[in-house]
Design a protein with these regions (language model features):
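Short linear recognition/processing motifs and adjacent strand/loop elements at protein termini
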Residues: 1-116
């Protein structure tokens, strides 16, 4: 099985993206502050150009941290919304394989992380 993360975007297209496992310490963009994350693997999802705030600077997302309690996905944290770049890092119990999908109507980007 898979644990699924879905990012939804305004507009007709998913922005450019890059997905990879990264080493600790996980750092916030801009400040460089260390971001504590649970898990034995950290899958970074970066979108560019993108933003997660309005023109007035208000966040467009409900939460910057989620703890979904899924078999492998332990936590999902926003680590960047700065200068046209948005990043999220998933803390996983085991850094297993993953796949990505782009979906339409509405525009969505999906990351499926294998359980084993």
């Amino acid at each position: 099985g898979f644990d699924r993360i879905v990012f939804e975007f305004a507009g007709e297209e998913v922005p450019g993206y890059h997905v990879e496992y990264i080493d600790k310490p996980v750092r916030a963009c801009g400040s460089g502050d260390v971001v504590p994350l649970a898990g034995d693997g950290w899958l970074q999802v970066r979108f560019e150009p993108a933003r997660a705030h309005t023109d007035e600077g208000k966040p467009t997302l409900g939460s910057r941290e989620l703890a979904p309690r899924l078999p492998n996905l332990l936590v999902l944290k926003s680590t960047c919304d700065f200068e046209g770049q948005v990043e999220w890092v998933a803390g996983v119990g085991s850094p297993n394989g993953y796949r990505v999908l782009e979906l339409e109507k509405p525009s969505r980007f999906v990351v499926d992380i294998k359980h084993k």
